[in-house]
Amino acid sequence: MSQIVTRFAPSPTGFLHIGGARTALFNWLYAKAKGGKMLLRIEDTDRQRSTKEAIDAILEGLTWLGIDWDGDVIYQFARAERHRQAVEEMLSRGNAYPCYATPEELDEMRELARKEGRPPRYDGRWRDRPASERPTDRKPVIRLRAPQEGVTVIEDQVQGTVTFPNKDLDDLVLLRSDGTPTYMLAVVVDDHDMGVTNIIRGDDHLTNAARQTQIYNALGWDVPRMAHIPLIHGPDGAKLSKRHGALGVDAYRDMGYLPAALRNYLVRLGWSHGDQEIFSTEEMVEHFDLDRVGRSAARFDFQKLENINGHYMRASSNAELFDAVMGLIPHLPDAEHRLARLTDARMEQLRAALPGLKERAKTLTELLDGAEFIFATRPLLLEEKAQAVLTAEARAHIAAMIPQLEAADWSAAGTETVVRAYAEQAGVKLGAVAQPLRAALTGRTTSPPVFDVFAVLGREESLARLKDQTA
């Protein structure tokens, strides 16, 4: 059996959207699971819409997700001459022909089809015209001489057997009148030349599969195995769109998701292995196959993604998480402000705070928000809830504790011993003093455990913040 070769072939007209990322992941996993290769092709034939920025975003998105490819990136536009050679071959076989229909004639065909309530199709008027009738004042398009009877059958690894009556498929354009190849042709020639054995893509390409199969047959080439995976829908069941929220992989990165978590979430969008939800990359590769991909659309669930991300954050080592936070900061809107405040001392405080922070946060941005107390400058701006907690009685408790804290062994355990002893001596519950301490130290009513905050901020800064609220 020949080596499995898959490909991911995005068009660089925007960011790497979440559906494309899942398609790339499925291709990557299938190749890895079968001991094969995944190739990357940039389908940049739309010169107006294809941009270098979009190409960079795709490459960066794949790299961030941990999806690598084999060999050099293939650029479709650079292969236009090869695409034209394939058309010459079809012309010589009699499987393609020049068509001189004018734009006006094509409009008339469309209008007639609309009136008769049928899909617009080219009527084949130049299919069998003799060369003597060809006009000399305009250049033709080149069309495929598609079969008009029978059916084109796709044996799809996800959708099963899909049959297309050939009468419903017209003679599609292979080369435009200016000599540029169409997408439909370029895809077939590139997949053949790249040795692609398996095409895995969204089921919005299913009709394309029938047309492309006809091109393969016209060239006498083997047709790769195809698998058309269902699209991703929003939580409301509609096709995933901008109104459902973030779409690009870069947006999920900037929202503080970990690549391993997003990878894990994406693999479960349409594929399953029993009831297992959390997969290491090794487990994905071990278990992935197309027979476990469903036919119905998968719904994107942000809450589930958050929960999976929270799991990966808690499972990450503090060193890994610190690196992830440092990697995220340059991509945040206030990156310059954050980086300016990121002194060596504060970086060490952030490292020290991570064990407590990661237990509460579901994303890196939530974690950074929870760490804001480290970067706050005195006197702290108090949130409304924190102001409400710092009553006159609460401030009096803080003032009474300061001398005892000044003498404490400065650690989470040491400060906890002092505060618990004070609460017992004062005849109040621990929360009655711990919550005001939290508000005075962080300006908020939510934070990592208050004794961890003492340890992270250190003796001098902690006592100074407490004194600010009792002055």
Curated annotation (Swiss-Prot):
Keyword set, alphabetical order: Aminoacyl-tRNA synthetase, ATP-binding, Cytoplasm, Ligase, Nucleotide-binding, Protein biosynthesis
Location, primary (coarse class): cytoplasm
EC number, UniProt record: 6.1.1.17
Gene3D superfamilies, A to Z: 1.10.10.350, HUPs
Compartments where located: Cytoplasm
InterPro entries named in the record: aa-tRNA-synth_I_cd-bd, aa-tRNA-synth_I_codon-bd_sub2, aa-tRNA-synth_I_CS, aa_tRNA-synth_I_cd-bd_sf, Glu-tRNA-ligase_bac/mito, Glu/Gln-tRNA-synth, Glu/Gln-tRNA-synth_Ib_cat-dom, GluQ/Sye
Keyword Protein biosynthesis: yes
Domain of life: Bacteria
PROSITE patterns referenced in this protein's UniProt entry, alphabetically: AA_TRNA_LIGASE_I
Motif ('HIGH' region): 10-20
Any single Gene Ontology cellular-component annotation: cytosol
Disordered, as annotated region: 117-137
GO terms of biological process kind: glutamyl-tRNA aminoacylation
Xref: Pfam families: Anticodon_2 (PF19269), tRNA-synt_1c (PF00749)
Annotated residues for binding of ATP: 242
Placement of sequence motif 'KMSKS' region: 239-243
Enzymatic reactions: tRNA(Glu) + L-glutamate + ATP = L-glutamyl-tRNA(Glu) + AMP + diphosphate
Similarity comment text for this entry: Belongs to the class-I aminoacyl-tRNA synthetase family. Glutamate--tRNA ligase type 1 subfamily.
Known role: Catalyzes the attachment of glutamate to tRNA(Glu) in a two-step reaction: glutamate is first activated by ATP to form Glu-AMP and then transferred to the acceptor end of tRNA(Glu).
This protein's name: Glutamate--tRNA ligase
Organism: Azorhizobium caulinodans (strain ATCC 43989 / DSM 5975 / JCM 20966 / LMG 6465 / NBRC 14845 / NCIMB 13405 / ORS 571)
